[in-house]
């Protein structure tokens, strides 16, 4: 039986490692997934923003999700990226995720075409109707421009398959407002590494992080400390991580995180255009953050 309990703790939005010619490196991907599981990451999110989904072909997107499910092999859950600004494309992605055994799907707010709240409602309801998988709404107005209002989220939550949200707004009033508006247990996950402790304090359940690609053990430890009531320990870990959190978003994700992984010898820094490797100032900041964590000499 599928695990339908709430996601908690440190979840990782996985990078998609690539060879220098831009082909996906599935061997390295498997090693990164093993590293995540061994470090205590509670779930994996392939083929999202951090996984460069906008520049993956449909075939590649499907292979990345299937590869993650196969490699995880039930040890942790897989929440597959299934977002598109085309409802029909998102439906196909969600159906594929279900067909290969993903545990849930993460569907971003449609970007660029700027739908109204009614358009957002119909978009997400159509996807939720198309598959039995639990679905998470991904709110990231910095990339999508539009956002789901709390009222629309409450309407969407009436669908039994819509079970939670990834909230990258960094608005700490939002998880409280959503909790009060939604008339069922609703799984709220932060999508902002820097503000995760504030999000947890506001009643959130966990974080889908980027930094956890680099230091999955520290991110998992921070969440465990919080869950066990060791608040001072959680704060200390988060303070220690803050320079790396900051550096990860000095330029467009996933440029910085891939560079950081390359510095640790875990994958190369190859990105697909229009994304490019970080500039020198960003590279210096990442190196300094890694040294502060004693990960570089």
From Swiss-Prot:
Binding site for pyruvate: 50, 208
Class of this enzyme: lyase
Residues of the signal peptide: none
Compartment annotation: Cytoplasm
Keyword Cytoplasm: yes
Pfam families the UniProt entry points to: DHDPS
An individual GO BP term: lysine biosynthetic process via diaminopimelate
Example GO molecular function: 4-hydroxy-tetrahydrodipicolinate synthase activity
Active-site residues (renumbered): 138 (proton donor/acceptor), 166 (schiff-base intermediate with substrate)
Gene Ontology cellular component list: cytosol
UniProt site positions, description: Part of a proton relay during catalysis: 49, 112
Pathway: Amino-acid biosynthesis; L-lysine biosynthesis via DAP pathway; (S)-tetrahydrodipicolinate from L-aspartate: step 3/4
NCBIfam families: dapA (TIGR00674)
Complex formation: Homotetramer; dimer of dimers.
PANTHER family xref list: 4-HYDROXY-2-OXOGLUTARATE ALDOLASE, MITOCHONDRIAL, DIHYDRODIPICOLINATE SYNTHASE
Family: Belongs to the DapA family.
Descriptive protein name: 4-hydroxy-tetrahydrodipicolinate synthase
UniProt lineage: Bacteria, Pseudomonadati, Pseudomonadota, Alphaproteobacteria, Acetobacterales
Gene that encodes the chain: dapA
């Amino acid at each position: 039986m599928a695990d339908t309990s709430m996601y908690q703790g440190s979840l990782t939005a996985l990078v998609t490692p690539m060879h220098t010619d831009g082909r996906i490196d599935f061997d390295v991907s498997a090693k990164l997934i093993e590293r995540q599981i061994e470090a205590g990451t509670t779930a994996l999110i392939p083929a999202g923003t951090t996984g460069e989904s906008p520049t993956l072909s449909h075939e590649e997107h499907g292979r990345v999700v299937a590869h993650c499910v196969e490699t995880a092999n039930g040890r942790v859950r897989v929440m597959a990226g299934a977002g598109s600004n085309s409802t029909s494309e998102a439906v196909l992605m969600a159906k594929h995720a279900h067909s290969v055994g993903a545990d849930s799907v993460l569907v971003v707010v449609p970007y660029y075409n700027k739908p109204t709240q009614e358009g957002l409602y119909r978009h997400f309801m159509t996807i939720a109707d198309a598959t039995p998988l639990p679905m998470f709404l991904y709110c990231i107005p910095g990339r999508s421009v539009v956002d789901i209002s709390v009222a629309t989220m409450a309407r969407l939550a009436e669908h039994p398959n819509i079970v939670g949200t990834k909230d990258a707004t960094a608005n700490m009033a939002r998880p409280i407002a959503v909790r009060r508006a939604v008339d069922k247990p609703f799984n709220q996950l932060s999508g902002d590494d820097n503000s995760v402790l504030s999000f947890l304090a506001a009643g959130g359940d966990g974080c889908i992080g980027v930094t956890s690609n680099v230091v999955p053990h520290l991110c998992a430890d921070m969440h465990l400390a919080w869950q066990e009531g060791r608040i001072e320990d959680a704060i200390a870990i988060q303070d220690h991580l803050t320079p790396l959190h900051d550096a990860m978003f000095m330029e467009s994700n996933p440029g910085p995180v891939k560079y950081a992984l390359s510095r640790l010898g875990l994958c190369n820094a190859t990105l697909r255009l229009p994304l490019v490797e970080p500039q020198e100032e960003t590279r210096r900041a990442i190196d300094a953050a890694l040294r502060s964590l004693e990960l570089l000499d």
